[in-house]
UniProtKB/Swiss-Prot annotation:
Reaction catalysis annotation: S-sulfanyl-L-cysteinyl-[protein] + uridine(34) in tRNA + AH2 + ATP = 2-thiouridine(34) in tRNA + L-cysteinyl-[protein] + A + AMP + diphosphate + H(+)
Gene3D superfamilies reported for this sequence: Adenine nucleotide alpha hydrolases-like domains, HUPs, Translation factors
NCBIfam families registered for this protein in UniProt: PRK00143.1, trmU
UniProtKB keywords: ATP-binding, Cytoplasm, Disulfide bond, Nucleotide-binding, RNA-binding, Transferase, tRNA processing, tRNA-binding
Location(s) in or outside the cell: Cytoplasm
Name the record gives this protein: tRNA-specific 2-thiouridylase MnmA
Organism per entry: Prochlorococcus marinus (strain MIT 9211)
Marked site (Interaction with tRNA) residue numbers: H155, Q385
GO cellular component: cytoplasm
Its job: Catalyzes the 2-thiolation of uridine at the wobble position (U34) of tRNA, leading to the formation of s(2)U34.
Residue segments, region Interaction with tRNA: 187-189, 342-343
Length: 406
């Protein structure tokens, strides 16, 4: 599919003396990767994916740009993003391909998100989009249509690829591709990537994993990339398109009034739909009370939101389903891990206890489930969000926090 693009400036010439030590290290690493140096770069039209493509070109790779068209409108993966991605490919003098994934995005992300909110949970659309819409379709399209066996994206994470010549080693770490946090702690996106399979990780490269966001901006400007100073989205793409998450949900779900109650059943307010609430939420409840109230639980069957003081929302454990084990195989025994239950939250110490999977886990081809026992009570644990397990910087695995009762 051909897209019209604005006239782009040619990429700036850079001598080796102008390169920073960090950039030289990244380029050197890319040059040393085994296999044919031909790759498709997932271009969203933002600065991160733009620099990813530029670094690969600098490292001497045969690069082709690949953009997924997910929806109409402004923003990355929308019509506006396609134009910027095409402009970057023009600057870098590389081919640009657009793949229409709007129907897949609608089914796997939009419908799943709306259904989740109806069920009183807070889904994590970014990880689902990565698993079902972005990585697998890009890998399959690049392999089938361009005979390219690798893809690269601008995610801030790292992959330590398996030592293919030691696949029979007793050392499990050498038998699996490992997913690691990005160097930039403020930008690390490994939390959203826990759901990627070993097969996918084997075909993926993350050139920005060793860089910081500020360095990326600086380098993009030095390259003269047209997206170097493009404003970064601060919200979910669907919320950005519609102006807010509430506006997005209002397009799909009509208002349905219900009660807001305390944990003892006392009615303290009214709401227009449980989909506008998430556990731990304090702002926007529309309730004047003698003390701050937080959402403690959501009961979809009763169309009811339960609120209370923050100390009533603490949990010592939670169940995690549809678990994907990334850097290790599924543990058969209890083990100590660090768990991150929200994107911007700090990892906390916990004990992971394997338990029997449900039929849903098995049907979703994720036959693993576990109970997480926190060292200290945790607040604002939201069903539908991901619980991702770490050991230091290594992503062990992760899954979906399951609904619970108070």
């Amino acid at each position: 599919m051909a897209m019209k693009s604005q006239k782009a400036k040619p990429i700036s010439n850079k001598s080796k003396l102008e390169r920073s030590p960090i950039e030289m290290e990244v380029v050197s690493h890319l040059k040393q990767l085994q296999g044919e140096h031909a790759i498709a770069v997932g271009l969203s039209g933002g600065v991160d994916s733009s620099l990813t493509a530029a670094l690969l070109v600098e490292a001497g790779w045969k690069v082709e740009g690949l953009t997924l068209w997910l929806m109409e409108g402004k923003g990355s993966c929308c019509t506006e993003g396609l134009v910027d991605a095409a402009g970057i490919c023009e600057q870098l003098k590389i081919p640009h391909h657009v793949v229409d994934e709007r129907s897949t995005f609608q089914k796997e992300v939009v419908e799943n998100l709306v259904n989740g909110y109806q069920e009183g949970i807070t889904p994590l659309p970014c990880s689902r989009c990565n698993r079902f819409v972005k990585f697998s379709p890009m890998i399959n399209w690049a392999r089938k249509n361009r005979n390219l066996k690798r893809i690269a994206t601008g995610h801030y994470a790292r992959i330590k690829h398996a030592e293919t010549n030691k696949l029979n080693s007793l050392d499990e770490r050498k038998n699996r591709h490992q997913l690691l946090r990005g160097i930039d702690q403020n930008k690390d996106q490994s939390y959203f990537l826990y759901d990627l399979s070993q097969e996918i990780l084997g075909h993926v490269v993350f050139p920005l994993g060793a860089l910081t966001k500020s360095f990326t901006r600086k380098e993009a400007n030095r390259y003269g990339l047209r997206t170097a100073n493009k404003k970064e989205s601060q919200d979910l793409c669907l919320a950005e398109k519609h102006g807010s998450m509430k506006a997005f949900l209002n397009n799909y779900l009509p208002p349905r009034k219900g009660e807001i109650v305390l944990t003892d059943g006392l009615v303290v307010g009214e709401h227009d739909g449980i989909e506008h609430f998430t556990i731990g939420q304090r702002k926007g409840l529309g309730i004047a009370w003698k003390e701050p109230l937080h959402v403690i639980n959501i009961q979809p069957s009763l169309n009811r939101v339960i609120v209370g003081p923050r100390d009533q929302s603490g949990r010592s454990n939670c169940t995690v389903g549809e678990v994907n084990w990334v850097s290790i195989s599924a543990p058969m025994q209890e083990r100590l891990v660090e768990v991150q239950v929200r994107y911007r939250s700090d990892p906390v110490k916990a004990k992971l206890v394997p338990i029997e999977p449900t039929i849903k886990d098995i049907k979703n081809n994720r036959p693993h489930r576990c109970r997480i026992e926190f060292e200290n009570p945790q607040f604002s644990i939201s069903p539908g969000q991901a619980a991702v397990f770490y050991k230091g910087e290594v992503v062990l695995g992760g899954g979906i926090i399951q609904p619970f009762e108070y």
